[in-house]
A protein has these predicted regions:
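P-loop NTPase motor domains
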Residues: 2-37, 48-334, 405, 414-449
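Short, polar loop/linker segments at the starts of domains and inter-domain junctions
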Residues: 39-41
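Conserved ATP-driven motor cores of ASCE-family P-loop NTPases powering translocation/secretion/packaging/pilus
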Residues: 326-432
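Residues immediately N-terminal to the Walker A/P-loop in ABC ATPase nucleotide-binding domains
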Residues: 44
Length: 449
């Protein structure tokens, strides 16, 4: 006999099968479940979201870009985009926004962010700390591979800090990067040491590194050590090129306090060696300003970080405080949309590629959107995050007179085969304490009547 389920009961069963997610902003993203039931994937405000999957699975077009559009429907929210392909810049750039890039080719007038290092330092709450931080980022890669040259490179870093100290405290002009770096490249050792002596805090540095006494400077002859230090100083100065050595007055401080302005960091792999220190500094500056107790920026900040782990390519760590922002940024109004192809690539964003800090930092992402993973560590980590459950298996006996054997085994809620079978545009959603749900995101054309 065939019994039909009453329509009312069938509707109740379908309602019970729908995931119980909290409501997000703008009604969420249109999707459908395995059975074809329509569902709205929420994009919660203030919740960090991690999106992972191999290339070509639709991480950007199906989720991250539409999610960013929903969050930016709030006119008070500011946004920072990090990307490699200018996808977000082409979609979200508006008149008045700023774009950080090594090259200014093809950009609208006044769109290029022309950073002024001196003005940035003067606007900071602690000038000396800002000077030290800028110097550390510029010399970080040299110091990491210093070897026996450590003392010379450290001396060059301290010399650069001394120059910034003189410009910030002893002059009134906000000299552009082009003017400052151009002058440093042309100065002789004697002229540079005489310039450093204008600030009392540099006197000890001059005696320790160069054997230079400002009170008895007449007849001073630069030592061989001075020449070695200048070599490493000029190596760091060579990083100032392209847009990073332009004449301008832009600062991160001003961006955070300008209403309705978004910032785009387009990382060009062709100029990665030059761009990396500046990109890492800008991201850390944004994070520090937003998390600071003294920050007067009340507007919520959305950071869309698409393939930001590529900053660590080439075996160089790119620690800008990502996991600190993920775990502590919610109270400060900082929200992250992080996209990566592999969770192991995030190790490069932790200090010294520390995998334990990177794994622990995943606690700052209550929502994960997992498209098809491509490596075993990412798969195993996702299965751990998504949880496990006991499944009962019954094994039939060989003889009909024997009893069947029943076993209970602890298995992941999403198996490796289920992850491997995910088609482009299909992903598992895990939000807070809800069970993972498989959805297929609907393209905009599919939502038309």
């Amino acid at each position: 006999m065939h019994y039909e389920i009453p329509p009312r009961m069938e509707a109740d069963l379908q309602a019970q099968a729908l995931p119980r997610w909290p409501q997000g902003i703008g009604g969420g993203l249109a999707a459908e479940l395995d059975g074809g039931a329509a569902v709205s994937v929420p994009v919660p405000e203030g919740v960090n979201i991690l999106t992972v999957g191999v290339t070509g699975t639709g991480k950007t077009c199906f989720f991250t870009a539409p999610a960013a559009a929903l969050l930016l429907s709030d006119p008070q929210r500011k946004a920072v985009f990090f990307e490699l392909k200018a996808t977000y810049a082409n979609r979200f750039f508006r008149p008045g926004d700023k774009l950080i890039s090594y090259r200014a080719d093809g950009l609208p007038p006044r769109a290029l962010f022309r950073w002024n290092m001196i003005r940035e330092i003067r606007q900071s709450a602690d000038r000396e700390a800002e000077i030290r931080q800028i110097s550390e980022f510029l010399f970080r890669e040299q110091l990491t591979a210093a070897g026996q040259n450590l003392s010379w490179i450290a001396a060059a870093r301290d010399t650069f800090s001394g120059v910034l100290r003189v410009v910030v405290d002893c002059t009134r002009e906000n000299s552009s990067n082009r003017e400052l770096i151009g002058a440093l490249r042309q100065q002789s050792v004697s002229d540079l040491l005489s310039y450093l002596a204008a600030h009392p805090q540099n006197h000890g540095l001059l005696k320790r590194i160069y054997g230079y006494d400002s009170a008895n400077a007449k007849g001073y002859q630069p030592t061989r050590r001075s020449g070695d230090v200048m070599f490493f100083l000029h190596t760091a100065l060579e990083q100032f090129s392209g847009a990073f050595c332009a004449a301008g007055q832009d600062t991160i401080h001003d961006f955070l306090r300008t209403e309705g302005q978004n910032l785009f960091l387009v990382y060009d792999l062709a100029s990665a060696e030059i761009s990396r220190p500046f990109m890492v500094y800008f991201l850390k500056k944004l994070k520090d300003e937003k998390l600071s107790n003294r920050c007067a920026v009340s507007a919520p900040l959305l950071m869309v970080l698409d393939e930001v782990d590529k900053l660590a390519d080439g075996g160089r760590s790119a620690d800008f405080g990502l996991f600190q922002a993920a775990t502590l940024g919610r109270e400060a109004g900082l929200q992250l949309l992080l996209t990566t192809q592999s969770l192991e690539q995030l190790y490069g964003l932790a200090p010294q590629f520390n995998e334990h800090l990177a794994t622990a930092g995943l606690a700052g992402f209550p929502m994960t959107v997992a498209f098809r993973p491509g490596d075993a560590p990412t798969l195993h980590t996702l299965q751990t995050l998504y949880g496990s459950d006991y499944r009962e298996r019954t094994i039939s006996p060989v003889s009909r007179y024997d009893r069947p054997a029943t076993h209970c085994e602890l298995e992941p809620l999403v198996s490796a085969a289920e992850f491997a079978a995910l088609a482009p545009g299909t992903a598992y959603i895990k939000l807070a304490d809800a069970r993972p749900v498989k959805v297929r995101f609907l393209h905009r054309k599919e939502r038309l009547p």
